[in-house]
Amino acid sequence: MLRWITAGESHGRALVAVLEGMVAGVELTSEDIGRQLARRRLGYGRGARMAFEADQVTMLGGVRHGLTLGGPVAIEVGNTEWPKWETVMSPDPVDPAELQNIARNAPLTRPRPGHADYAGMLKYGFDDARPVLERASARETAARVAVGTLAKAFLKQALGVDVISHVISIGDSDPYEGPVPDAADLAAIDASPVRAFDAQAESSMISEIEAAKKDGDTLGGVVEVVVAGLPVGLGSFISGQDRLDSQLAAAIMGIQAIKGVEIGDGFTTARRRGSAAHDEIYPGPDGILRSTNRAGGLEGGMTNGQPLRVRAAMKPISTVPRALATVDMSTGDEAVAIHQRSDVCAVPAAGVVAEAMVALVVARAALEKFGGDSLSETKTNVAAYLDAVAQREPRQESSDEQPARRAANTAG
């Protein structure tokens, strides 16, 4: 069972992530993790913190000479700003007199609408929002991207698949409706300032960000994660918690600021009639073919051999420069919300975080299906399963290739 957990605060010494259940023999380096963390900092509309925030990666355990050992893998992502926060965020007690004159320690008693501040202060009995926002911050996703890098490496090395993402829309920009990108397109996507797969969509997104920035506002958007080449049968129809789509939805909804998830065409499919909602099956010389992929690669909670497509809707960033109305928890008076340094738009980065979470969930499903204590054993099991599936899958035996040609011509 693949399990992961993170620890640490936004302005603490470091974030730490632990991934348990990974097989031995997976190639992984600090540089691999650093590259993924750098991708997380990408995006037009990011705030000043991205300019000087550097992710210092240290692998604390579970990896030797670039290979996983089969035990828990612990990864630390250091905070380069720690010296500025060492007193305020000290784990050990600090003399109140010393804290009194530190501006960073000023009580944060005006909760920000849309953040965890208000509910967290009441739930945990805090008079100050600092303990809440430090852990609730999206900075925590750096730790998840770190362990997600290992999940991606496993999927690539065991199954030969890549996990990629791109931005569909930002704010009210024209949504991208073109072909689904694949791994060969990732470099071009990352080269886009908004991680778009289309120049026209990119221009529309940038215009939205510029307008919001001018108005002192923030924006959300929609990202899509794509995983092509997965075998049939990851996940299960046996019970709700075993369905891969339920696991993916939970993992994506667990990302800060994500308010909606859809698999494949999702909400669009809900507006279609049944005759136009499903992916028809055609015989082909190498197995079955699909005319469409509206289901997003999942049917009955299982992968069906088509590209997995997961979309996530991110709300606008809650820390708005044009401060929103709130209440001062210390007095009960009307107030304006506290304003922490933040971004205008972090949608491009959300795609990278979503990649990590999809990779973790799919890697867990793959390990549950194929098992193994080492990468080589898992690969042997994968090969045997694929061979068995290939022998069971029907193939077109007649010379009539019309169904296959029709499927190829209408695929989308």
Curated annotation (Swiss-Prot):
Gene3D superfamilies linked to this entry: Chorismate synthase AroC
GO BP of this protein: amino acid biosynthetic process; aromatic amino acid family biosynthetic process; chorismate biosynthetic process
Co-factor(s): FMNH2
Organism, as annotated: Mycobacteroides abscessus (strain ATCC 19977 / DSM 44196 / CCUG 20993 / CIP 104536 / JCM 13569 / NCTC 13031 / TMC 1543 / L948)
Pathway note: Metabolic intermediate biosynthesis; chorismate biosynthesis; chorismate from D-erythrose 4-phosphate and phosphoenolpyruvate: step 7/7
Annotated catalysed reactions: 5-O-(1-carboxyvinyl)-3-phosphoshikimate = chorismate + phosphate
Cellular-component GO terms for this entry: cytosol
Binding locations of FMN: 135-137, 256-257, 300, 315-319, 341
Protein name: Chorismate synthase
Region annotation (Disordered) ranges: 391-412
Family: Belongs to the chorismate synthase family.
A Pfam family this chain is assigned to: Chorismate_synt
EC top class, as a word: lyase
Annotated keywords: Amino-acid biosynthesis, Aromatic amino acid biosynthesis, FAD, Flavoprotein, FMN, Lyase, NADP
UniProt KW Transmembrane helix keyword: no
Its biological purpose: This reaction introduces a second double bond into the aromatic ring system.
Feature: compositional bias, Basic and acidic residues: 391-404
